Amino acid sequence: MTFTLPEMVQRSSFSCFSRIVRRPVASTIRAISGQYSGMAVSNDSSCAEEIAAVDKRIVVHNGLVKKNGQIRFGAAEHISFVLLEAMKADPDIRCLIEFSAPEEFVENMEDAGLEVTLIRKREESIAETVRTAIASSRKFPDVLADLSNKKNVTIEVLGKTPADVLSKMDMVL
C-alpha cells in the first residue's frame, strides 16, 4: 500500500499522539494546570495548515492525558507558528507541547538541566518573539517559557520527536 506524504504524516501523527495521550502522568501534572493547550508534529512543513495537531485541548483525566478533539492538519494555529519558527532555526525540531504551569515549574525545568528561555509575548508577533528568544539563547532552547500571563507561565517544550518531548517532560515530572 502506498501513501502520499500528507497521509504518512497523518498516520505517524496519529500513532505518536496515541502514545502520548494514553501515557500515565505523575500526579504533579494536575497541579500544573489540568489541561494542555496542545501538541503539534510536523514533517517538513512550511505553513500552519501542514502541521498535525490536536483540535481542541488535551486534558488530564483520571491520571491519563487524553485529547478532546481529533488530530488534524491546521488544528492549532498558535503552536504551529511557534513550531515553524523553531524549525527555521533548527530543522531537526519537529514537535512541541504547550501547557500552563506555576512559575516554580520553570525553575524545576532549569534544575533538571533543560535549556529554558524566558519570553514575553506582548507586543511582537509570535514569529518575532520566537526568533528573538532563540537568538538570545546560549544554545537552542528545550523550553520557551512565556511570562506574560500573571496567573501561570505558558510553557512550550520543543523536541525532535514526540519521544524527545516526552523525555524532556519526564525530567521534571
Annotated model-derived regions:
Residues 3-173:
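Conserved mixed alpha/beta catalytic, RNA-binding, or beta-rich assembly cores of soluble enzyme
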